[in-house]
Amino acid sequence: MAIRKYKPTTPGRRGASVSDFAEITRSTPEKSLVRPLHGKGGRNAHGRITTRHKGGGHKRAYRVIDFRRHDKDGVDAKVAHIEYDPNRTANIALLHYLDGEKRYIIAPYGLKQGAIVESGANADIKPGNNLPLRNIPAGTVIHAVELRPGGGAKLARSAGVSIQLLGKEGSYASLRMPSGEIRRVDVRCRATVGEVGNAEQANINWGKAGRMRWKGKRPTVRGVVMNPVDHPHGGGEGKTSGGRHPVSPWGKPEGRTRKPNKPSDKLIVRRRRTGKKR
């Protein structure tokens, strides 16, 4: 994928860029793998905002992605199309299996239309093939990794990211995450070989606020420009700095959003570098 820059015909177009979609081979999704997607606007079942800055945006249809692939072991599949997916940063690949079934997977870098992919313990080590970590050599770059055997891919699914398999010891494999964190995962967990494609997506300059609204992202207003009734940093005569340590609109100190006693933390060998004191 390459980035195409717009000519500066308007202030919103100046500096803006877009993907050239050169890898995309079909513009309409497979009907049997599409489900309706209803926007919630960041609201919960009571109608209250639980996630701010969400709402609006272009209507989308959800593409059902196969994040497991274990039930297709030993069945070869041909890559019929590389398609755009509005619900994620990565592109997706439509597979036609020899038994007649069609499924979507996340498209890894280098996977082309017409390629043959497979899954299972005896699959070759090449992009798009899915197999257990115990059957993947150390040093291999992988993506779409399970956290628990049979639980479906949870790690490294965004455009351009990858995980490196550092080694295996006993029933665990050591993985270097995109953040730099080193984590142990059960060797029975499955992963797909290669890195996720569409890496240039990170270099897109959106150019104007309107394009973010098309994506369903609403403005983020700073607390210091609000009134005291709306935010702890609000109010004051003239321009102020907030006058206190940063807090949320509900008075909670900023940062430290991770659960401190998460059970899976015991499998972290080395934490990611955050730049914060712990």
UniProtKB/Swiss-Prot annotation:
What residue spans carry the region label Disordered?
27-58, 224-278
Q: Name one GO biological process term.
A: cytoplasmic translation
Q: Basic residues: which segments have biased composition? A: 37-58, 269-278
The UniProt entry's GO CC annotations, sorted and at most eight, read: large ribosomal subunit
Q: Which InterPro entries match?
A: NA-bd_OB-fold, Rib_uL2_dom2, Ribosomal_uL2, Ribosomal_uL2_bac/org-type, Ribosomal_uL2_C, Ribosomal_uL2_CS, Ribosomal_uL2_dom3, Ribosomal_uL2_RNA-bd_dom
User: Which GO terms label this protein's molecular function in UniProt?
Assistant: rRNA binding; structural constituent of ribosome; transferase activity
Swiss-Prot/TrEMBL keywords: Ribonucleoprotein, Ribosomal protein, RNA-binding, rRNA-binding
SMART domains in the cross-refs: Ribosomal_L2, Ribosomal_L2_C
Superkingdom field: Bacteria
UniProt feature, compositional bias: Basic and acidic residues: 253-268
Please tell me whether the keyword DNA damage is annotated for this protein. Answer: no
What PANTHER family does its record include? LARGE RIBOSOMAL SUBUNIT PROTEIN UL2M, RIBOSOMAL PROTEIN L2
Complex and partners: Part of the 50S ribosomal subunit. Forms a bridge to the 30S subunit in the 70S ribosome.
Q: What does this protein do?
A: One of the primary rRNA binding proteins. Required for association of the 30S and 50S subunits to form the 70S ribosome, for tRNA binding and peptide bond formation. It has been suggested to have peptidyltransferase activity; this is somewhat controversial. Makes several contacts with the 16S rRNA in the 70S ribosome.
The entry's family comment says: Belongs to the universal ribosomal protein uL2 family.
Q: What is this protein's record name?
A: Large ribosomal subunit protein uL2
Q: Per the UniProt entry, what species is this protein from, by scientific name?
A: Mycobacterium sp. (strain KMS)
**Name of the gene:** rplB
